[in-house]
Amino acid sequence: MASTEVDSRLGRVVIPALDKVIKNASWRKHSKLAHECKSVIERLRSPENSSPVADSESGSSIPGPLHDGGAAEYSLAESEIILSPLINASSTGVLKIVDPAVDCIQKLIAHGYVRGEADPTGGPEALLLSKLIETICKCHELDDEGLELLVLKTLLTAVTSISLRIHGDSLLQIVRTCYGIYLGSRNVVNQATAKASLVQMSVIVFRRMEADSSTVPIQPIVVAELMEPMDKSESDPSTTQSVQGFITKIMQDIDGVFNSANAKGTFGGHDGAFETSLPGTANPTDLLDSTDKDMLDAKYWEISMYKSALEGRKGELADGEVEKDDDSEVQIGNKLRRDAFLVFRALCKLSMKTPPKEDPELMRGKIVALELLKILLENAGAVFRTSDRFLGAIKQYLCLSLLKNSASNLMIIFQLSCSILLSLVSRFRAGLKAEIGVFFPMIVLRVLENVAQPDFQQKMIVLRFLDKLCVDSQILVDIFINYDCDVNSSNIFERMVNGLLKTAQGVPPGTVTTLLPPQEAAMKLEAMKCLVAVLRSMGDWVNKQLRLPDPYSAKMLEIVDRNLEEGSHPVENGKGDGGHGGFERSDSQSELSSGNSDALAIEQRRAYKLELQEGISIFNQKPKKGIEFLIKANKVGDSPEEIAAFLKDASGLNKTLIGDYLGEREDLSLKVMHAYVDSFEFQGMEFDEAIRAFLRGFRLPGEAQKIDRIMEKFAERFCKCNPKDFSSADTAYVLAYSVILLNTDAHNPMVKSKMTADGFIRNNRGIDDGKDLPEEYLRALYERISRNEIKMKDDGLGPQQKQPTNSSRLLGLDTILNIVVPRRGDDMNMETSDDLIRHMQERFKEKARKSESVYYAASDVIILRFMVEVCWAPMLAAFSVPLDQSDDAVITTLCLEGFHHAIHVTSVMSLKTHRDAFVTSLAKFTSLHSPADIKQKNIEAIKAIVKLAEEEGNYLQDAWEHILTCVSRFEHLHLLGEGAPPDATFFAFPQTESGNSPLAKPNSVPAIKERAPGKLQYAASAMIRGSYDGSGVAGKASNTVTSEQMNNLISNLNLLEQVGDMSRIFTRSQRLNSEAIIDFVKALCKVSMDELRSPSDPRVFSLTKIVEIAHYNMNRIRLVWSSIWHVLSDFFVTIGCSDNLSIAIFAMDSLRQLSMKFLEREELANYNFQNEFMKPFVVVMRKSGAVEIRELIIRCVSQMVLSRVDNVKSGWKSMFMIFTTAAHDAHKNIVFLSFEMVEKIIRDYFPHITETETTTFTDCVNCLVAFTNCKFEKDISLQAIAFLQYCARKLAEGYVGSSLRRNPPLSPQGGKIGKQDSGKFLESDEHLYSWFPLLAGLSELSFDPRAEIRKVALKVLFDTLRNHGDHFSLALWERVFESVLFRIFDYVRQDVDPSEDDSTDQRGYNGEVDQESWLYETCSLALQLVVDLFVNFYKTVNPLLKKVLMLFVSLIKRPHQSLAGAGIAALVRLMRDVGHQFSNEQWLEVVSCIKEAADATSPDFSYVTSEDLMEDVSNEDETNDNSNDALRRRNRQLHAVVTDAKSKASIQIFVIQAVTDIYDMYRMSLTANHMLMLFDAMHGIGSNAHKINADLLLRSKLQELGSSLESQEAPLLRLENESFQTCMTFLDNLISDQPVGYNEAEIESHLISLCREVLEFYINISCSKEQSSRWAVPSGSGKKKELTARAPLVVAAIQTLGNMGESLFKKNLPELFPLIATLISCEHGSGEVQVALSDMLQTSMGPVLLRSCC
């Protein structure tokens, strides 16, 4: 025994209570009790008497439930001794005795002195405690209010206690007792306390079950939240406070109450309900003996579910895959789960009861049971939600309870049913997919879809239910993916939205309704709230899935148009331990099964269902076409068996049309009907059961022949399945008809005189092959038919099916719903039946078998697209119509909120069409297009537009245009309200075409022409009513303005003040993300364009806002800003080129402001943002036809330079492009103004140009080059050339670009350029980009028509090259020569044609005089300069010799004497200056070029003797038609040929002279090989000339055609003589000089051949006897002259032969002697030949001959 100190603790509790018991006990009746009490008192007061009983005493060693508050415990015997008087006192039934005993027990439990487990099935200790609890429970039967509270207190303390554990029957007994007190107590406080105690106990039981621990901390419930609205109205606050104190006090008395967080807990007929037997612990068939119909239903449901579970597990058990957990766990394993299961089942059974209406107590019991279930479900934990046992309990018991209560006419019952369903959907939907698919339509949709005659209270409850359902954003999405995308489920989401729409629209006109107007209005408002909630839920879900930031965040959404990596996760129906499933708030998920449902799978499922629905819809109109459609769409197979199976199983098919189709006589229909009937198995079925089963799926057609075919096949099938029932199928056929007639007669209310059994028997006599069927058989058949009507599944249509069929119900479970909810009017007497329960069970089994029973927890946002497709049109109608028709503030607010959520969802999902539909509708409701009609609701719509812009700006995309259009219109009206003049007054001054600009300053804008007199002057322009046009800022005018409308407008303008400042839309644009700001800018530009293009009222509001938003967003990252400016750039270009001068000026001034702001930002090197920013100036400068605009641009750019020059970097490029464009302008002022600025830039800011990249310097040079072509003032051109020279000097000094600076840049001597190799300019891109534009620009000026400009340009060009060329590398020189110097001669090398006197040059040089001037002055000078430059830098550029020579050759080749002469002169000049430095290879190049020039300039007279000319002449002789024209044309051609030939002949003479000069200068430097090449060139010239001279036909033609040759002299005789003479000289000198490479034999051979050739030419002419009869001049005279001309050459040849050595002469004498002999006999034109011949004979030939004779 424990110490005395400790004993006193127990004694302080027990002894006072026992004293009271003794005091209040009757000594007669309770003497034994008193004696026990005294004994215990003495035992507790006397320590020596309270020592443990001897070990020999029974039970002394067994611990008991009592302990002393410390470590020591009382034995079981001692515990029994102490507790026995308390138990006995509590059982006396005397209030005064019972009260202290119960109070003592409560204190013992509260203080933890009682420990152990109370369970009647346990050991001695458990039995003792069980008896103690049982005794307390029975005390409430005394019917005392105070004792009731004490009992409740004790029981709640017992359940709450951690030391005392209540399980099994004891727990149920406690619940039963509290339940009984709630129903039986007459005290309201006691009732409330009993209810609160039940809730607290239930919460404790389930919380412990979830934690799997009895020590889990529990918070007291909040009593006020348990009170239903009805209870709250009937109770006063003191009751609630009293009950709350009662609960809290008890909870505080238990140890560990406050260990948990301060979370606020809102956890807020009976014998059969509290049975502890579980499925499998008793024979289920024994339960069918119950006489309580409700309990019979419950047991039947339980048995059916249990059997189904066993059947479903047989296969698993056979495979050994099922763990032995659930049943055993509940029965003997986890007692906490078992307790929770028992309590839950008990509450379900209590809620199933259908008490008589005259028994309100039992109805209250039903209600409180439902309330408890509601609380438990609302606060269900993970174990409850996912355990198979509990899910099975829900399916077994709770579903039956919902089924029974769903049609109750008591609103509280219906409300609780809805609340329970809400909990199931919210938290258990993953495990109850099939059940929710049934109960949601049954409880919610049937009420929602009944629009005309609903029960108002039920409808309001359903609407509030849907509103609560939308709180969890995951629920609607899960409903859609699991039902609307499931072929075998009803379109719950679609039906819900459509039902809400119909409710929101109200009862259709002309429809009879039971609703009062206030009721209908309240219902419409609540429906609209639900629609808003649906959209809000969808928006919340997509926000959560995509983790969208707040509306003002700049974070970019990049995953809207693609699927998330997580797909939709299928969850097995009711399996698993819970999973994430892609969402957070909903706790209804179960363990995710394998496999993901991605966006494609969702889309395919949805598309499949929609197509199937379409096919069923077609079938319900035309069955044959429907079947054809379904077969073609692969929804149904084409075999009769597959079609029959579809007709039998598919939901939504019209039963009448099925019957019609089956009765058709066509081949396919007939085969389908046979397959349909053959699919039934009638074995062992009664005849009427077979007919019932057969006719359940369709309605017999009205046509007799169709019925006959169907019933004939039925009879055949029945007899085949039951061959012994009838003798033939005829019997079954006739009996089937008879049964159908009996069914109609018995159940048709129109038939007054019913058929009797005898009548039925009589009608069927002799049908069995002449024999009668047994009378008993027929009578039983009659009874069954009369008692139970044969009907189809959808007999007794509910209100919703009386409406036209639509796709939303085609695949739903409406057939079940119509059984559950019959026609209105039967609701009051409605009772569930065995038939109903059985039917529901079949449907659940069917759903469980289908693969679609897999539950999908949606996480892929693609599903929202399909949801929007379903609901956007109803939503738009639901919000638009009330907003248009009603001015109520509440309705307006709701509609606008709905618009906002709809636009959010469609925008985030990038559903452009749907988004634009909502946005345009909302914009229309602003009424800004018709301001006279503006009301308060329109003002609210404007506010909604502003809110939309602020919160959804990141996702609006193209819809920004509609919003900004509204903003524009609003601001227009707002200004009118303030009396400000419209923007049109800014654009009032007339357009000018003169070159005089009205601008005084670059930042000026047109002044207002006249002051506005007030708002009325301008209001009329805004008054013209029009329809909303989302693409413009002006409506379409339709009516004139009345005075009343004007007054309305003035008053409405004041309403606009409520909206506030619209500018925040623009100021907050910097919070838009990178893509949204671009969409925003595009839309603003479009709206601005519409404003400015308005012919009557142009405005600049949006244009000013463009400037603002560009300013606000200028600090964005460069990449984003570039995209923004790309849009703005195109906009400013378009506006800047506007025909309205004022608008264009305003645009350019706005652009100037932006540019000034942009130039405040520093730009890093190698970036191009400034240049891009200023490009609009460039484009407008080029495109604009307005002088004022171009001048404004010049002034704007000038201002930028003057004020921001330090920050200008890449912007120089655009600036110089503008000035370059201005240089070509047709207006003098523009040119002068721009050059003035360029001059200032170069003089004052040149270092700013050169410090940037190389291209800037290049642009500057190009600009100066453009000014050198100025046609207005020669001084500008000269100054520009001077600036180019300055630029060249700076470039050479290394001031242009850091990378161009040479090392060292300056030499110590006066800054002269150093000449080190390191100072060479390389052929880098930078050097090319720098030097080439400058040099090329100067070279281009060589073609300027002004001689002075040409000279100065060439001088500057060559001075620059001469002064700085020593720093050029060879490669750079090569590029300079090719691209700069040679380009000077490109034109003349190609296009100069001396034969065309009136040719027009492509560069603008008109007439031959200008061409000749250029040739004689500029070309010659340029060639000299080129030669001089080459000579000066020969050491560097000598590898370019060949290219220079080719330049000369190309000039020589041109058929122009002056040009060729210049080329030849340059060649000679080059040879004279640097020839002495040439190597053999270089001389070879020179000689080769000379030979090429000689060959290319050969005269050609072949055309004169060609066949074409001869044909032309003969044709002229034959006809005189057009002879004059032909003659002129021929003469022109001949003149051109002859002129060309003469020109080439002259050029060849120049070539011979040049060769002679070069030979004379470098005779001793040339090798034999060089000389022979020159010889070949000269000999070729001579040979060609002789050939022409010897062509007598040619000479005669030239004479005959009137050639300019007036004599018979050979046309090219001089050329021939000079060329042969030169050849002779070369050969003679070669023999005498004998240079390097000399070959005597070769040279002598050439010389002998040349001499012989000359002599032969002379002899041929001198001795010729042929004379042409066509010669006009006597031949003798011409011959004489020719011989005279040839004489010197012949003399030279004779002398050369004579000077040969004797041996050489003797060697060649055989060849020469005949020529010498012939020459003696010839006629000579000069005595010189004879003299030379005589000398040769005397000095050379004579001695040779004499010696040979000797």
UniProtKB/Swiss-Prot annotation:
Null mutant phenotype: Abnormal nuclear numbers and positions. No embryo sac.
Active-site residue list: 703
Tagged with keyword Acetylation: yes
Residues recorded as bearing N-acetylalanine in the entry: 2
Subcellular location: Cytoplasm, Cytosol; Membrane
Boundaries of every SEC7 domain copy: 601-788
Cysteines paired by S-S bonds: none
Chief location bin: cytoplasm
Chain positions with Phosphoserine modification: 586, 1307
InterPro entries (UniProt xref): ARM-type_fold (IPR016024), DCB_dom (IPR032629), Mon2/Sec7/BIG1-like_HDS (IPR015403), Mon2/Sec7/BIG1-like_HUS (IPR032691), Mon2_C (IPR032817), Sec7/BIG1-like_C (IPR046455), Sec7_C_sf (IPR023394), Sec7_dom (IPR000904)
Description of how activity is regulated: Inhibited by brefeldin A.
A Gene Ontology term for the protein's cellular component: trans-Golgi network membrane
Ranges of Basic and acidic residues composition bias in the record: 565-588
Region annotation (Disordered) ranges: 44-65, 565-596
Compositionally biased tracts (Polar residues): 47-61
Molecular functions (GO terms): guanyl-nucleotide exchange factor activity
Keywords: Acetylation, Cytoplasm, Guanine-nucleotide releasing factor, Membrane, Phosphoprotein, Protein transport, Transport
Membrane topology: Peripheral membrane protein
Annotated PANTHER family: GUANYL-NUCLEOTIDE EXCHANGE FACTOR, LD29171P
Function: Activates the ARF proteins by exchanging bound GDP for free GTP. Plays a role in vesicular protein sorting. Involved both in the nuclear division phase and in the nuclear fusion phase.
Protein's name according to its UniProt entry: Brefeldin A-inhibited guanine nucleotide-exchange protein 3
Organism for this UniProt entry: Arabidopsis thaliana
Lineage of the species this protein comes from: Eukaryota, Viridiplantae, Streptophyta, Embryophyta, Tracheophyta
